[in-house]
């Protein structure tokens, strides 16, 4: 969304650009506007939309464009839930597989899935919350640099999955100690 509100902070007409767009539906006004702005301001602009919706604008525009290649996720990942858990996971994993195939491939995906299943099995019954029934009211995720986005997305998922009943925040570790730590 920052790209749409401040395009010249991110788009440099003097350098080629590969814009990677993640969009479950591929129809959000921000996603479509980001593509249009990139095409408008950057002469050598290429697009890689990663989406779960074959009928979405991101996918349809890409298949009809000379400067785009779309990655369409399986239809089963086009989840309808507000938190988009399967779609974002599949889109992110697919992006990693495209840009780091020697590190992320079907075998590593299988290994991760097996490890996750082993962890879930070892944790036992989830009928009681992960932290018991403590009256938690807020959670803060910390991340800086490349992990700031993960902290932001984690906070958003908690907010969505609890329907706002648990206040979720994010910050950088050093930024958190200057005021926001008063949350805890």
Give the positions of each predicted feature:
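Glycine-rich phosphate-binding loops that contact phosphosugars or nucleotide phosphates
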Residues: 1-114
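Active-site phosphate/pyrophosphate-binding segments
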Residues: 63-184
């Amino acid at each position: 969304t920052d790209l749409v509100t401040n395009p010249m902070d991110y788009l440099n007409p003097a350098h080629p650009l590969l814009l990677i767009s993640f969009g479950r539906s591929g129809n959000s006004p921000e996603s479509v506007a980001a593509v249009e702005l990139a095409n408008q301001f950057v002469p050598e602009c290429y697009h890689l939309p990663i989406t779960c919706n074959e009928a979405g604008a991101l996918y349809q525009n890409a298949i009809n464009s000379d400067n785009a290649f779309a990655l369409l996720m399986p239809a089963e990942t086009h989840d309808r839930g507000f938190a988009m858990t399967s779609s974002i996971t599949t889109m992110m994993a697919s992006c990693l597989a495209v840009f780091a195939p020697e590190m992320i491939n079907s075998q590593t995906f299988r290994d991760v899935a097996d490890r996750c299943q082993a962890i879930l099995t070892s944790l036992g019954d989830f009928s009681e919350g992960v932290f018991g029934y403590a009256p938690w009211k807020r959670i803060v995720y910390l991340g800086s640099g490349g992990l700031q986005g993960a902290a932001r997305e984690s906070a958003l998922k908690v907010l969505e999955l609890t329907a706002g009943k648990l206040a979720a925040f994010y910050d950088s570790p050093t930024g958190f100690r200057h005021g926001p730590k008063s949350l805890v």
